[in-house]
């Protein structure tokens, strides 16, 4: 996750063929302590409700520069359908409340994130805003913000995910056009880390017991990968790895539990 967070206009979504998935999400310093304390502060009623389903009001924002980056309604609905399919077994569903389209070359080039979000962000801290941007810098496919305790108005406004436009179902980003980039980024919105270690070690990098230790990100779609022998094969099919879209098909029960905990601790009721 230690990747550049600077966004700049490099090329249109359809003109970049990504060699591998890249995500700019970085957990805040001391985040796991914040997570544990926020969850511990919940009352018995909240912690007993972890098996209840979660429905998230969702706002999709399409940023264009002229015709570059436009996404038709059919593909936006396909993105919501894909996310509902991917998260359904974990008890999470997304309800599309509104889609917006804004023709602004500056925002479509990934510049002025604060200005863009101040103008476009909708809903509350329990709402999901996804900004589809044709030009994310340095080959990034997406970036999203982790949930925080006691969010300020600025934190609420800056919340949400920025996703490359060409990664929606049927999009133009080769190997990453089944809508799973948004699924991956929303995982961070719901408190999930990457399944692999960021420093090449075989530690429990994602704080989830049923994802085996993994010392490196996955590239492509290998038949198998075992970067930490003895702990189980790598989670190459997990949405929180870096595999091709065709390779991704699962969250674990442990990840579903962490999502429920993060939702109750950070977003429910906000």
Curated annotation (Swiss-Prot):
What does the UniProt keyword field contain? Disulfide bond, Glycoprotein, Hydrolase, Metal-binding, Metalloprotease, Protease, Secreted, Signal, Virulence, Zinc
Return the similarity comment.
Belongs to the peptidase M43B family.
Per the annotation, which location comes first and is thus the protein's main one?
A: secreted
Is RNA-binding among this UniProt entry's keywords?
Answer: no
One Gene Ontology term, aspect cellular component: extracellular region
Record-linked PANTHER family: METALLOPROTEASE MEP1 (AFU_ORTHOLOGUE AFUA_1G07730)-RELATED, PTHR47466
Secretion signal, residue range per the UniProt entry: 1-19
Under the GO molecular function aspect, what terms does this record hold? metal ion binding; metallopeptidase activity
- Judging by the UniProt lineage, the source's domain of life is Eukaryota
Q: Does the keyword Translocase apply?
A: no
Subcellular location, record wording: Secreted
Q: Matching Gene3D superfamilies, A to Z?
A: Collagenase (Catalytic Domain)
Instruction: Output the lineage of the source organism.
Output: Eukaryota, Fungi, Dikarya, Ascomycota, Pezizomycotina
Intrachain disulfide bonds: 221-247
Q: Name one GO biological process term.
A: proteolysis
Biased composition of type Polar residues is found at 212-227
Q: Which InterPro entries does the record match to this protein?
A: MetalloPept_cat_dom_sf, Peptidase_M43
Name of this protein = Extracellular metalloprotease MCYG_04966
Where are the annotated glycans?
Answer: 135, 199
Q: Which SUPFAM superfamilies match?
A: Metalloproteases ('zincins'), catalytic domain (SSF55486)
Recorded hits in Pfam families, A to Z, give:
Peptidase_M43
Q: What does this protein do?
A: Secreted metalloproteinase that allows assimilation of proteinaceous substrates. Plays a pivotal role as a pathogenicity determinant during infections and contributes to the ability of the pathogen to persist within the mammalian host.
Question: Which residues does the annotated region (Disordered) include?
Answer: 208-227
Active-site residue list: 185
Q: Which residues bind Zn(2+)?
A: 184, 188
Q: What's the Enzyme Commission number for this chain? A: 3.4.24.-
């Amino acid at each position: 996750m230690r990747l550049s967070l600077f966004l700049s206009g490099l090329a249109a979504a359809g003109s970049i063929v990504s060699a591998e998935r890249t995500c700019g999400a970085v957990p805040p310093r001391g985040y796991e302590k914040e997570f544990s304390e926020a969850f511990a502060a919940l009352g018995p009623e909240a912690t007993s409700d972890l098996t209840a389903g979660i429905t998230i009001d969702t706002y999709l924002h399409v940023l264009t520069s002229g015709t570059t980056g436009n996404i038709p309604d059919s593909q936006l609905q396909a993105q919501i359908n894909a996310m509902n399919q991917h998260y359904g077994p974990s008890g999470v569903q997304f309800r599309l409340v509104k889609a917006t389209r804004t023709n602004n070359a500056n925002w479509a080039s990934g510049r002025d994130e604060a200005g863009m979000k101040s103008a476009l962000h909708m809903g509350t801290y329990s709402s999901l805003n996804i900004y589809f941007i044709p030009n994310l810098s340095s080959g990034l496919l997406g970036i999203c913000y982790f949930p925080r305790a006691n969010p300020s108005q600025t934190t609420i406004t800056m919340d949400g995910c920025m996703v490359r436009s060409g990664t929606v179902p049927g999009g133009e980003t080769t190997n990453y056009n089944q809508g799973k980039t948004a699924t991956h980024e929303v995982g961070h919105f719901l408190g999930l880390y990457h399944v692999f270690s960021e420093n090449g070690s075989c530690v429990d990098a994602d704080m989830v017991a049923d994802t085996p230790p993994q010392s490196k990100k996955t590239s492509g779609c290998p038949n198998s990968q075992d970067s930490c022998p003895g702990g189980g094969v790598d989670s190459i099919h997990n949405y929180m790895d870096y595999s091709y879209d065709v390779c991704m098909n699962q969250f674990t029960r442990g990840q579903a539990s962490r999502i429920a905990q993060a939702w109750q601790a950070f977003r429910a009721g906000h």
